[in-house]
Amino acid sequence: ITLLWLMVAGLLNRWYKAKLGLVLGISYAMTGLGGACFNFIGQFILGPNLLTEPTWRDLYLFYGIAAAILSIPFTLFCIRSHPEDVGLKAYGAEIQAGEVISSENLELPGIPAKQAYKKWYFYVLIIAGCLFNIGGIYPQHFTTFYQTVCAVDASGVAIPDLMIMSGTLEGCCMIGMAVGKVSIGAIESKSIQAALIFGSVAGVIGLLGIWYGGFNKVLPVLFFGGFIFGMLYPLVTTALPYITRLLFGEKDYDKIYSVVLMPVNLVGAFAASGLALIYQGPGWNTFFIVGIGVAIMCFVVGSVVVKFGVKDYRGDKVQSAQAA
């Protein structure tokens, strides 16, 4: 996951001077779309009996072969690190008359990494990223919620007709992620503040829908809530790399963003277990209340880092970055 976030964001940062937010959104939306498709395929391969070992083996074999066929040829033959490697400039970059375009003449604007690490808002950005990622971890537990709350009767016995749909909630969430990535990418290209509002509000509304729909077995509300909540997840995949470039520029973007991602993903690893402890202990109600609080804090902390970081950094013409 870390390699996916870092390499895609770093590559697109080099190729797009303008419209970076939109392109990030479209690119990461494909991961959500693929996840949704594979999730629906997987639930039918597994069937109602989720504990049968051979079906899991077949499923992972299918996923592995599909991933190899779809990714390796394009990685080997289609990807180039910099546009200058093939005699081009980044989309939206100005070209001067008589300019020689090559990787040897490449000089990107921005703050050096060592200087960025001394900025207080760099660490607030990490906190914001951690909150974004905690929100993104929530869908990992939605299938458990569905199987233990929605797909069982009053005595706790599984309902086969509902159990076979156990991947649908997470699938709807992944579709929401795909839509949200494009939406947030397009919005942040105009206003990063509006993108933060969009993602946080979607998180709150989505959790409320899943909470109500699951306990009351109202499947349309449940699945729609999953779709809406999926639009929170792009804050970590689409908004975080965009904010990083907005605050620190392109010069040492890869170095800075990689350092940001280390604690962000570390917190995500602990959050997966921590969220499980919440619903296994205090219960699912506490799980959803905490999630709503996280969604709200995503907006609050994200707004703080954008407001003060943008004021401090003017080397890359913030007005241009906001329109990029």
Model-derived regions, located:
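C-terminal transmembrane helical hairpin of 12-TM major facilitator-type secondary transporters
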Residues: 173, 190-243
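Flexible cytoplasmic inter-helical loops of multi-pass small-molecule transporters
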Residues: 80-110, 313-321
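Symmetry-related core transmembrane helices of the 12-TM Major Facilitator Superfamily/SLC fold
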Residues: 58-77, 287-305
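Loop-to-transmembrane helix entry/capping segments in MFS-fold secondary transporters
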Residues: 18-27, 163, 250-260
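Intracellular juxtamembrane helix-capping segments at the cytosolic ends
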Residues: 2-16, 235-248
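Extracytoplasmic gate region of multi-pass secondary transporters
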Residues: 114-184
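Helix-to-loop junctions at the C-terminal end of transmembrane segments
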Residues: 179-192, 279-280
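A late C-terminal transmembrane helix in Major Facilitator Superfamily
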Residues: 35, 233, 247-281
